[in-house]
Amino acid sequence: REGVETLSTRFEVATSDLYAQGFDPVLGDGDLGDLAGVPGNLAAQAGESYAAGQLPPEVQAEQAKLAAAELLILQFPLWWYGPPAILKGWFDRVLTDRFAYGDLDPELGVPRRYGDGGLTGRRALVVVTAGEDERSIGPRGISGDLESLLFPLTHGVLWYTGIETLD
């Protein structure tokens, strides 16, 4: 909270406390609008629902915050070497096809991704807490270094959608 207060003195800050919001992390029929109950690829259907303006209000609100953001700060405890399930579910529901990825490069005809995704121009700072110290989480630690542990998030989620991760 202190960080939010400090940043708020110089910047417009929007926060999301997924637990306090009661955010449902499960991507399902409620995210699909008219396509609910129709067999198919959930991610593609969520993208169609986004394009049709049929995503649930809580997802639309999170997308609006992200669309307006220059900097995304993800703060979470490291659970089983990754983000908590509720945050993973936030990625699944909010970073939809056609919003965060999936646009085709007009010259190449292939999806724009890895630094060229739908959220290009935004940056992220990942802040984690862990129950281990540098003897365990470090270059010579049994768990490996933190950069490697976070690679699926920093590269596979953030960079894929165009968000540059700050060191």
Question: What residues fall within each predicted segment?
Answer:
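FMN-binding flavodoxin-like domain, especially the glycine-rich phosphate-binding loop
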Residues: 58-64, 68, 82-167
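N-terminal beta1-alpha1-beta2 submodule of the flavodoxin-like/Rossmannoid cofactor-binding fold
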Residues: 1-103
